[in-house]
C-alpha cells in the first residue's frame, strides 16, 4: 500500500464513523489497533484519545498533535464514504488531521526500526477539541509529565486557501473563545394587566441593544473582536408578560484587556436591566480557549520545513477569529507553532468552509503535511 492509498483508506474510514467530543471510543480503538500493529507504545490517560511515543537518537523531544472528534452536523455530501453516524460529521477536517498523524507515526516507526529517528517524538491523538477542551484535560491529567517536550506542532485544514499553501503567523493565530449567558427573571401577568408584571421581554430587548454598543463605543476600532448573540428567548404564552428571558453568545478576541472590558460592560448591562425594568438579571461566563500563540523562535524552522516539503508559505496578516484548544499546549506545555494547510480546489469542488455539511478535500494534501512534519523533525534545533 503506497502512502496515497494509506491516507485515502484511513481518512475515509474515519470520515464514515465520526464521533462527538469525549465520545470518540471507536476512533480511539481504531488508532490503538493501528499502533499495536506497528508495535508503537502508547498511553491512554483519558477515556478517549491516545498518546504514542518513539525514542530517537537525541535528548530532544518534540510533540505533534491531531484532534480526533467530530461535530453534530448532518452530512450533505454525495460521496461513497459519507458519514454513517446520524447527525455526526467530520465537518472540521479532524479525520484528515488524525490520518496525517497516523502516516507520520508510520514514517517515524520506519526510521526508528533503522535506528535513524533523529529525536524523541510524542504523537498526540487528542479528544474533545470542539467542546470539552481536550488539550487542557490531557495536560491536567499528567499525560505529558514523563516527556520533556521542547516544542509542539500542529495543523488545521484550511478550505479558504489553495492546495499546496500553508498559512503561518507569529504570535496570535487564533482568537480566544469565551461563552456568555444572560439569565432574566421577572414577574408574569396577563397582557390586559401588563402594568402588574415585570417584563423580561423589554429587559431582553435592552440587553440585545446594549451588547451591540460595546464594540462600537468601548473597544478599539482597529482591533478585530466579535461579540456574537447566538440564541435568545423570552416568554411563555402569546397573551402573558414574559417572566423569564435568556440570551447566549460567544466573545472572540485576541487581547485579554479587551475581554475584560467586554465582561465589565456586560455586568453593567445586567445591573441596568434591574434598575430600568425591575427584572432580575445575571450574566455568567464560561471560559473557553485562550488565543493560540505561535512562538516566534520556531518560525524559521517552520518556514524551512514548509519550503523543504515544496509547499508555499503564506503570511497571515490578521489572526483567525475562531478558537482552537491547541492554545493550551503553548500556554502550559512548551513553545508551539500551529499552521493552516490549504485544501481548496475549485476544479474538484472543494470550496466549502469549516463546520459546513459539505466540507471535503483531496487526501493527497495529508502527505504534504507529513512531508512538512518530517522536515521539521529532521532539522529541529532546540529553541
From Swiss-Prot:
Molecular-function GO terms, alphabetical: hydrolase activity
InterPro entries named in the record: Amidohydrolase, Bact_exopeptidase_dim_dom, Peptidase_M20, Peptidase_M20_dimer
Q: For this UniProt record, give its keywords in alphabetical order, as a comma-separated list.
A: Hydrolase
Keyword Hydrolase assigned to the entry: answer is: yes
Q: What general EC class does the enzyme of this chain belong to? A: hydrolase
State its Enzyme Commission number(s): 3.-.-.-
Q: Which domain of life is it from?
A: Bacteria
Q: Say yes or no: keyword Nucleotide-binding present.
A: no
- One Pfam family named in its UniProt record: Peptidase_M20
Name the protein family.
Answer: Belongs to the peptidase M20 family.
UniProt-recorded name of the protein: Uncharacterized hydrolase SERP0968
Amino acid at each position: 500500500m503506497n502512502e496515497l492509498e494509506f491516507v485515502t483508506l484511513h481518512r475515509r474510514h474515519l470520515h464514515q464513523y465520526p464521533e462527538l467530543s469525549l465520545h470518540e471510543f471507536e476512533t480511539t480503538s481504531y488508532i490503538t489497533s493501528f499502533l499495536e500493529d506497528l508495535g508503537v507504545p502508547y498511553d491512554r490517560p483519558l477515556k478517549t484519545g491516545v498518546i504514542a511515543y518513539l525514542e530517537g537518537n537525541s535528548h530532544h523531544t518534540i510533540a505533534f498533535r491531531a484532534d480526533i472528534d467530530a461535530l453534530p452536523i448532518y452530512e450533505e455530501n454525495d460521496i461513497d464514504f459519507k458519514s454513517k453516524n446520524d447527525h455526526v460529521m467530520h465537518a472540521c477536517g479532524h479525520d484528515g488531521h488524525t490520518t496525517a498523524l497516523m502516516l507520520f507515526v508510520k514514517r517515524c516507526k520506519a526510521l526508528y526500526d533503522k535506528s535513524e529517528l533523529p529525536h524523541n517524538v510524542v504523537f498526540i491523538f487528542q479528544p474533545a477539541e470542539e467542546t470539552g477542551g481536550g488539550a487542557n484535560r490531557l495536560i491536567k491529567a499528567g499525560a505529558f509529565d514523563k516527556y520533556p517536550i521542547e516544542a509542539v506542532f500542529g495543523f488545521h485544514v484550511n478550505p479558504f486557501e489553495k492546495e499546496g499553501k500553508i498559512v503561518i503567523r507569529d504570535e496570535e493565530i487564533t482568537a480566544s473563545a469565551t461563552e456568555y449567558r444572560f439569565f432574566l427573571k421577572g414577574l408574569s401577568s396577563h397582557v390586559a394587566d401588563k402594568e402588574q408584571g415585570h417584563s423580561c421581554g423589554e429587559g431582553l430587548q435592552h440587553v440585545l441593544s446594549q451588547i451591540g454598543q460595546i464594540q462600537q463605543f468601548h473597544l478599539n476600532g482597529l482591533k478585530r473582536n466579535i461579540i456574537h448573540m447566538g440564541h435568545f428567548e423570552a416568554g411563555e404564552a402569546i397573551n402573558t408578560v414574559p417572566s423569564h428571558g435568556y440570551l447566549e453568545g460567544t466573545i472572540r478576541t485576541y487581547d485579554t484587556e479587551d475581554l475584560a472590558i467586554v465582561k465589565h460592560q456586560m455586568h453593567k448591562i445586567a445591573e441596568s436591566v434591574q434598575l430600568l425594568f425591575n427584572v432580575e438579571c445575571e450574566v455568567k461566563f464560561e471560559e473557553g480557549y485562550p488565543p493560540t500563540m505561535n512562538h516566534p523562535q520556531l518560525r524559521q524552522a517552520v518556514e524551512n520545513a514548509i519550503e523543504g516539503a515544496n509547499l508555499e508559505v503564506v503570511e497571515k496578516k490578521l489572526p483567525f477569529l475562531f478558537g482552537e484548544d491547541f492554545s493550551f499546549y503553548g500556554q502550559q506545555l512548551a513553545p508551539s507553532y500551529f499552521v493552516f494547510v490549504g485544501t481548496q480546489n475549485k476544479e474538484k469542488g472543494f470550496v466549502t468552509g469549516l463546520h459546513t455539511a459539505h466540507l471535503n478535500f483531496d487526501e493527497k494534501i495529508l502527505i504534504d503535511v507529513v512531508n512538512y512534519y518530517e522536515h521539521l523533525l529532521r532539522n529541529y534545533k532546540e529553541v
